[in-house]
């Protein structure tokens, strides 16, 4: 029997097929299981803390992958980049009311896709935050042998 939360995400997926304007997208999946989850998110440009303004997903494969994408979008609503970075497979599985071990990979795929989208968003935000054309570069490493 499906958990009520999982069934709800399957019946009415949140943000399925929606790609926000100026979206940063991350995808995860593979040939091993045939599942693919793509998470897209857009940042609020007026938000100093990097609040997520909109999110959507697309998924193919098993129903658990679809539900995990939907649950991820639900968890992203109103979150900042930092809060979203704390969302992992455990939080996604919990949002679905738990997943059996053979379906846990769906939450892991959604988490991986989310973190790839967040990486893209962080890079975009860093480019937008450049002030005065100055760039500071920090380097570490050994002594130049030349």
How should these model regions be labeled?
Residues 47-59:
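Short, well-ordered strand-loop elements centered on a beta-strand within folded domains, enriched
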Residues 64-79:
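Alpha-helical support elements that line or immediately flank enzyme active sites
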Residues 1-20, 25-26, 53, 79-83, ...:
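C-terminal binding/interaction regions
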Residues 35-45:
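Short beta-strand elements
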Residues 33, 59-68, 106, 110:
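Short, thiol/selenol-centered motifs that function as redox-active sites or metal-ligating centers
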Residues 128-146:
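ATP-dependent adenylation/nucleotidyltransferase module used to activate substrates
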Residues 27-32:
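Short Gly/Pro-enriched turn/cap motifs at secondary-structure boundaries
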């Amino acid at each position: 029997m499906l958990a009520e939360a999982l069934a709800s995400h399957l019946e009415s997926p949140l943000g399925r097929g929606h790609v926000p304007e100026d979206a940063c997208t991350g995808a995860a999946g593979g040939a091993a299981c045939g599942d693919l989850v793509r998470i897209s998110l857009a940042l609020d440009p007026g938000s100093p803390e990097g609040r997520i303004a909109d999110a959507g997903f697309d998924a193919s494969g098993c129903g658990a992958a679809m539900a995990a994408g939907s649950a991820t979008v639900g968890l992203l609503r109103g979150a900042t980049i930092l809060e979203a970075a704390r969302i992992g497979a455990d939080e996604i599985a919990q949002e679905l009311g738990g997943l059996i071990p053979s379906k846990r990979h769906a939450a892991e795929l959604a988490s991986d896709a989310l973190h790839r989208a967040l990486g893209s968003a962080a890079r975009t935000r860093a480019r937008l935050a450049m002030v005065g054309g100055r760039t500071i570069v920090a380097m570490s490493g050994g002594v130049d042998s030349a």
